[in-house]
C-alpha cells in the first residue's frame, strides 16, 4: 500500500497528465515534417470521409491505449480537487478536442494519415481511463489518495 501512495501522489498525477499530453502530441505529429496542403486536397477529404470500420486492429488498440493515461490521470486530478461530475465531462470533451486537433494537424504531415475514426478511438481511451480511475476511487479509495 505504501508503494501505491508514493506512485499515485497528486504531483505524480499532474506529471502523468502532462506527460500523457506530451506523448500523445509527439506520437501523433512525429516526424514533424509539415507541408502546405490546399483546401482542395485529397488529404482533407480523407479526414472527413473515414468511418469507424477503417483502420486495422493494431491502430485501433494503439489509439485507445494512447489516451487511457490522459483519462486516468485527469480523472484522478479532478477527484482530488473538485469531484463535481461535470468536470469529468469537461475532461472527456477536452481530450476529444485534443484528439480532433491532432487529426486536423496531421493533414499537413504527408507521412501521417489523418482520420476522424482515430479521434473516436482516442475518445474511447479517455473514457476507459476515467472509468478505471472512478472504479479505483470507489473500490480502493486508499490506494490512489495521498496526503500531498
What are these language model-derived features?
Residues 1-119, 123-148:
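Bulky hydrophobic segments
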Amino acid at each position: 500500500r505504501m508503494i501505491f501512495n508514493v506512485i499515485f501522489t497528486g504531483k505524480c498525477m499532474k506529471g502523468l497528465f502532462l506527460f500523457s499530453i506530451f506523448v500523445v502530441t509527439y506520437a501523433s505529429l512525429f516526424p514533424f515534417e509539415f507541408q502546405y496542403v490546399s483546401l482542395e486536397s485529397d488529404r482533407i477529404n480523407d479526414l472527413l470521409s473515414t468511418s469507424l470500420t477503417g483502420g486495422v486492429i493494431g491502430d485501433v488498440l494503439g489509439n485507445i491505449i494512447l489516451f487511457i493515461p490522459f483519462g486516468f490521470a485527469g480523472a484522478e486530478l479532478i477527484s482530488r480537487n473538485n469531484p463535481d461530475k461535470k468536470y469529468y465531462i469537461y475532461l472527456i470533451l477536452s481530450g476529444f478536442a485534443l484528439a480532433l486537433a491532432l487529426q486536423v494537424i496531421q493533414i499537413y504531415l504527408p507521412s501521417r494519415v489523418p482520420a476522424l475514426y482515430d479521434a473516436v478511438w482516442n475518445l474511447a481511451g479517455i473514457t476507459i481511463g476515467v472509468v478505471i480511475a472512478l472504479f479505483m476511487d470507489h473500490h480502493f479509495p486508499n490506494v490512489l489518495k495521498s496526503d500531498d
